[in-house]
Amino acid sequence: VTLHFVLPGDVDDPTSPSGGNVYDRRVIQSLAKLGTAVREITIPGTWPQPSHTARARLDQALAGIEDGAVVLLDGLVACGVPEVVVPHAGRLRLVVLVHLPLADETGLPPSVAARLDAAERECLHAAGAVVATSPWAARRLAGHHGLARVHAITPGTDPAPPATGTDGVSRLLCVASLTPRKGHDVLVEALATVTDVPWTCAFVGPERSGGPVRDLIAQHGLADRIDLIGPLTGKPLDRAYATADLFVLPSRAETYGMVVTEALARGVPVIASSVPDALGNGGLLLPPDDVTAFAQALRRWFTDEDWRRDLRSRALTRRTELSTWDETAAELVRVPASLRA
C-alpha cells in the first residue's frame, strides 16, 4: 500500500527550518526504512492562507489520487482549506497530521484566528483520523474541536554524543524561529538582569519577525553578548548544540518542542516553558511569559554549581528515555492501517 504524503512546498528549504518540516522529512526517511512506499506531494503556497493557485494545485493533486488510497496531509496545508480537502474525504482515507493548531500562532488578528480555527475544525471532522505530535496537543485538539479521538505520536530523536559544552556554564543556546510565539523577548529581558556574570547566548533560527527582538537587544546593550546566527541545519546545528552549556526555550506555545529533545539527546541541561511532554523530568519547566521566573532561573544557573550538576544529571537521564524516528514512523503507519477503505 502506498502512502501519499501531502507536504508544504518549503519542507526542504534550509532558510526556513521548522519542527513540522523536520518531523515530516524524518518520518518519510524512516517509513522508507520500514518498507512503506511513500509518494511525496509537495504543494508550494503561503499555507495556511494560500493563493487561489495553490488551492487549485492541492485540489488537482488530491483529485489525481485513486479512490480508497491512504493520504497523510500536513495540517499546515490541509487545515486552512476545508473547501478543498473535505470534498475528497468520502473517497480517500485521509489522515491529518497537526503540528500546531492554526489559531495558536501568536500575533494573528482575532478575526483571522477565528476563521482559521473554524476551517481547521471542519477539516479535522471530515478526516478519517487525526494525529497530533504530543499528548498535550492531542488532548487540546480533541477537546477544542470536539473530536472523538486524536492519536498522539511524538517526534523521535537522533542518537548523538553528549555535548562537551564550552566551560560548563556560560554558553547559552536558543533554537527557535524569531516569531512572537517563541518568546525571545522574554529571554532578552531575563538576560538583561544577569549582565554582572559572564555569558553569551546564540539565537539560532530564521528571522520571520526579528525586528522587535533586535531592537530589544540593542535597547539593553546586549548586542555583544547575544549572537543572532540565523537558521542552521545539519553539521553547523550539531556544532551549536555540542558547544552549548545550557539550552533555553521561552516559548509562549508549543505542541511538543522538538528542539528540547534535540538538546536532551546530547545531555544539554534545559530551562524552558510550554514543553512539558518533550522535557519530562529532564530540566526546569517555567510558566510562559514570565520574565521574573526566567531571570531567577538564569541567576541560579550561573551561581549554584550543585543545581547545575543536578540539571545536567536530569538531562542525561532523560537522554536515555527518548524514542527514535523509526519508532515514530512505526506508530504513524499503524494509524491509516486502522481505517476502512
Which stretches of residues belong to each language-model region?
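Conserved acidic donor-binding segment of nucleotide-sugar-dependent glycosyltransferases
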Residues: G283-T292, R300-E305
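Short hydrophobic beta-strand element within catalytic cores of glycosyltransferases
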Residues: P269-A272
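Glycosyltransferase donor-sugar binding loop
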Residues: V175, T200-R214, G230
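Short alpha-helical donor nucleotide-sugar binding micro-motif in glycosyltransferases
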Residues: P231-L232, R239-A244
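Conserved donor-binding/catalytic core segment of Leloir-type glycosyltransferases
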Residues: T157, A163-K182, V188-A192, A202
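Membrane-proximal helix-turn-helix segments that form the acceptor-binding/catalytic region
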Residues: L102, S111-V130
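Aromatic "clamp/platform" in nucleotide-sugar-dependent glycosyltransferases that forms part
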Residues: R252
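Nucleotide-activated donor-binding/catalytic signature segment of Leloir-type glycosyltransferases, i.e.
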Residues: V213-L232
